[in-house]
A protein has these predicted regions:
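Cytosolic juxtamembrane N-terminal segment immediately preceding the first transmembrane helix
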Residues: 1-101
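Helix-loop junctions at membrane interfaces in 12-TM secondary transporters
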Residues: 33, 151-163, 354-357, 377-392
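Conserved MFS/SLC helix-loop-helix module at the cytosolic interface between two early adjacent transmembrane helices
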Residues: 117-158
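Hydrophobic core of transmembrane alpha-helices in multi-pass small-molecule transporters
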Residues: 145, 157-173, 295, 374, ...
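Glycine-rich segments within core transmembrane alpha-helices of 12-TM secondary carriers
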Residues: 174, 183, 190-219, 224-236, ...
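Central mid-sequence intracellular linker of multi-pass
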Residues: 189-194, 217-283, 482-511
Length: 541
């Protein structure tokens, strides 16, 4: 009879799992958390292409013939005769829009002006409505705005400024949603890997974006830089609403084993709707470590995504086709390094020999040290050696990608129930760098040109020069140096007291008790303890 009861229970469970089928047969055979990661991966590719093509489109659609390089400005290039303003600017004399360099800087920064306002809002919206609705709606609105970009650009500079501003506004909620949902989906020993799968979509999107945009601009016209990605985003939206769910508890097809593995691994009571302890969050040094990390790391990322085609054209002298291919290289290196470092971090964490906090700090220190060194070398090259400059840009992005295994995974570790909110605060700081990086470049150019006019009687409209870029690279190296030190010192990975809920302590103690009966240590919420399920050797819990 007992055998019959046991068989009945097994049959009931089997029947329950078999009933969780759908039209998406392939997705049903893959663990639900990896389906979610794949959705974010593809979504980030689509998002990056949709919003990132504008930087290269500006190079093509703006007429450069009115921006004559003054004769005396060649003095700037005297140390590097081969890097002077040669044929590159002539490539774009057919551009239909007449925008000054300063206006280009303002328009390129417009996305970030809107982006910064909805970071914290995004975290709160995710807590209230869930990631599925907020992320999907944001992507839909961003796609529509991207398709409207050609019409807005031809209407007036301020029309495209408004479109880019609104794109930033709706896009600002995306990453807070990402961190919020992984706080409910990511088991402790897989957090770095799952986040890396999502983040790899960003450099891969740029790898596809730059060659694709240069091809579309050369063969079909710059308008198609905005139209083609819009169509791909529509396909992704269908998959997102079919396959994405806010938590394992809400997923209708997840297997019970996976659901139990995730919920017991996280060890928190996800039924609570906690209020954000804003005072404790805003006065927490580990939170500010992430803000500084995001600001200093994003300085390099946002600067490249907005200014790399400009640098390739005006300083290194590449035409539009070569520009598109070479602009993709740094992001290709970043993608490889991101995947490798994330896998290495998870392996080290699972090994249990090094405290998790020092694993994270190790990647932070390595990444920022490499970025600072490369930035200083780039500043001294001044565009004299295009091959070396491109190589250093690639290496810089490779080091920058180590931050994913460093501080970027910490949000779901030190404050899992508020990970969307803490990331929103950090990314607000990161967005500031996206606003000031292009403006600082053009301010430096303007001041350099003003100095030339005062003392060298140089006349004409300013253009980006190697000297101006050198200053920017020095500033970037300084920012990354200070940010890296601050982040490494104050970074924490243990769950902070203000991030624990009423059910967390009991849930954790229960799991420890279960683990003790099996001589096991479960996935731990404290960074200084190993997070792999490891066997105890002749000791008791």
């Amino acid at each position: 009879m007992a055998s019959s009861d046991t068989g009945g229970k097994s049959e009931t469970k089997s029947e329950r799992d078999s009933e969780k089928g759908s039209c998406c047969l392939l997705a049903d055979k893959i663990p639900a958390r990896y389906v979610l990661a794949a959705l974010f991966f593809v979504g980030h590719i689509s998002m990056t292409i949709s919003r990132g093509g504008f930087a290269l489109a500006v190079v093509v659609m703006v007429n450069s013939s009115s921006r004559v390089t003054p004769a005396n400005q060649t003095d700037t290039y005297q140390l590097c005769p081969s890097s002077g303003p040669g044929n590159a600017s002539a490539q774009n004399d057919q551009g239909e829009l007449d925008w000054s360099e300063s206006l280009k800087g303002v328009i390129l920064g417009a996305f970030f002006y809107g982006y910064i306002f909805t970071q914290v809002v995004g975290g709160l919206l995710e807590q209230k409505f869930g990631c599925k609705i907020v992320y999907g709606t944001s992507t839909l609105l961003g796609t529509v705005l991207s398709v409207l970009s050609p019409v807005a650009s031809r209407t007036s500079p301020w029309a495209i400024f408004a479109v880019r501003f609104c794109m930033g506004l709706v896009s600002g909620v995306l990453f807070p949603c990402l961190y919020g949902i992984w706080g409910r989906w990511a088991p402790p020993t897989e957090r770095t890997k799952l986040l890396a799968i999502c983040y790899i979509g960003l450099p891969l999107g740029n790898i596809i974006n730059y060659p694709l945009s240069s091809f579309l601009a050369a063969q079909l016209g710059w308008e198609y830089i905005f139209y083609i990605p819009g169509a791909s985003a529509a396909v992704w939206l269908v998959l997102w609403f079919l396959l994405g769910y806010d938590s394992p508890a809400q997923h209708p097809r997840i297997l019970e084993e996976e659901k139990k593995y995730i919920e017991e691994g996280i060890g928190t009571n996800r039924r609570q709707k906690p209020k954000v302890p804003w005072l404790k969050v805003l006065t927490s040094p580990p939170v500010w470590a992430l803000v500084m990390g995001q600001f200093s790391s994003n300085w390099g990322v946002f600067f490249l995504t907005t200014q790399l085609p400009n640098y390739m054209q005006n300083v290194l002298g590449f035409n539009i086709q070569t520009n598109g291919l070479l602009s993709a290289l740094p992001f290709a290196v970043a993608m490889v390094c991101m995947f490798a470092s994330s896998a290495a971090a998870d392996r080290l964490i699972q090994g249990g020999k090094i405290p998790k906090v020092w694993i994270r700090r190790g990647f932070v220190i390595t990444g920022y040290t490499g970025m600072v060194i490369c930035g200083v070398i780039l500043a001294n090259l001044s565009g004299c050696n295009p091959a070396a400059a491109v190589s250093l840009l690639c290496i810089t992005q490779g080091f920058n990608s180590l931050t994913v295994a460093g501080f970027r995974a910490v949000h779901v570790e030190f404050a899992p129930r508020f990970s969307g909110v803490t990331f929103a605060l950090a990314n607000t700081g990161g967005t500031v760098s996206g606003i000031f990086a292009p403006l600082l470049l053009y301010l430096d150019i303007y001041l350099s040109q003003w100095y030339d006019q005062m003392y060298n009687t140089c006349h004409g409209l300013f253009q980006p020069t190697p000297a101006a870029w050198s200053t920017i690279f020095y500033i970037g190296a300084a920012i990354q140096g200070v940010g890296g030190i601050f982040t490494a010192v104050f970074l924490r990975t243990d769950v902070q007291p203000w991030a624990r809920g009423e059910g967390d302590k009991g849930s954790f103690d229960k799991n420890v008790e279960l683990a003790g009966s099996k001589d096991l240590v479960i996935a731990n919420e404290h960074a200084e303890m190993p997070t792999k399920v490891v066997e105890m050797q002749n000791t008791k819990l």
